Amino acid sequence: MSGPALKVAITQAQPKWLDLAGSVEKTVNLIAEAAKGDARLVAFPECWIPGYPGWIWQRPVDPIINTKYIQNSLSVNSAEMNTIKSAAKENNIAVVLGFVEAIDTHSVYIAQAIISPKGELLMHRRKIKPTHMERTVFGDGSGSDLTNVADVDFGGDIGVVKVGTLACWEHALPLLKYHTYSQKEAIHIAMWPPIDPHPGVDAPALWSMSAEGCQNLSQTHAIEGGAYVLHCTAVCNEEGIEGMKTKGGLLFQEPGGGHSAAIAPDGRRLTKPLADGNPAAEGIVYADLDMARVVMNKGFIDVVGHYSRPDLLWLGVDKAQKGCVVPKREPEQDV
């Protein structure tokens, strides 16, 4: 089966740790590199700007590094974000960005953005529940963050494609995934931090947190959703290990973490690992996505269509944005 093909780029790179300006510069360079490789969409990993806070798995409280982290996080309405949007427009490429969002109260959130080839911010959301030790740094998302799929217009034979994204272990939340499927995504970006292979069957480390376990979750999302999945991971080399002092901790102990890949709608891996599987290697994984295969797989499994039983099982959703201050309504005056 053959249909219109969309070339995509999946980054596998080390962030500029805790350096907002350096992070934006590297992001712009990777956007340009992906466009030169004829990609129409480029994906970045979880917390790409300014890097995933690996120290939380070594020591949960570090006010010095945490302060620097907040100061180097990215605001949605900022000159830095405008620079990234301009790079998307100049290179005529869609950008799916993982970043740490800072707000004016100095709280930070694990966030994602989808930017069109025209430089428009089509979607911005926050991870609805940070995972385990991440809660020492990040706040929760809210109802509006359940909208995680956007229409991206690539023009030509491709036209409009529904592109969605989730962060890390959001791929282990069945109800959130089902709501994502209901938005009819055709391409899904699964964002992950640097992840290492599991040390062995007798090790106490969770297999579900390993490179193998995380890829399994991405492949499951592809099968259940009938969508292409761009499995995007970051890299952490000595610069990150030394800078965050993670040696001897649960994660980020050795250079590596990179396992980016493209996954087909039936769950198969489409691409080979970079540099013969060297997880410390930086680069870009490219893939040509035959969009007709989405249709073919949906014909077999459509979990929000013909392969569902809404008369028996259904999902309730509250998309309202929750605020800390809710003004009390004044009673209406009798006329």
UniProtKB/Swiss-Prot annotation:
SUPFAM superfamilies xrefs: Carbon-nitrogen hydrolase
Root EC class: hydrolase
CDD domains assigned: nitrilases_CHs
Known catalytic reactions: a nitrile + 2 H2O = a carboxylate + NH4(+); 4-chlorophenylacetonitrile + 2 H2O = 4-chlorophenylacetate + NH4(+)
Activity under varying temperature: Optimum temperature is 45-50 degrees Celsius.
pH dependence of this protein's activity: Optimum pH is 5.0-10.5.
Domain CN hydrolase stretches: 6-291
Coiled coil segments of this chain: none
EC number: 3.5.5.1, 3.5.5.5
Matching InterPro entries: C-N_Hydrolase, C-N_Hydrolase_sf, Nitrilases_CHs
GO molecular function, one term: arylacetonitrilase activity
Function as written in the Swiss-Prot or TrEMBL entry: Nitrilase that hydrolyzes preferentially phenylacetonitrile, (R,S)-mandelonitrile, and 3-indolylacetonitrile.
Matches recorded under PANTHER family: ARYLACETONITRILASE, NITRILASE
Entry protein name: Arylacetonitrilase
Organism: Arthroderma benhamiae (strain ATCC MYA-4681 / CBS 112371)
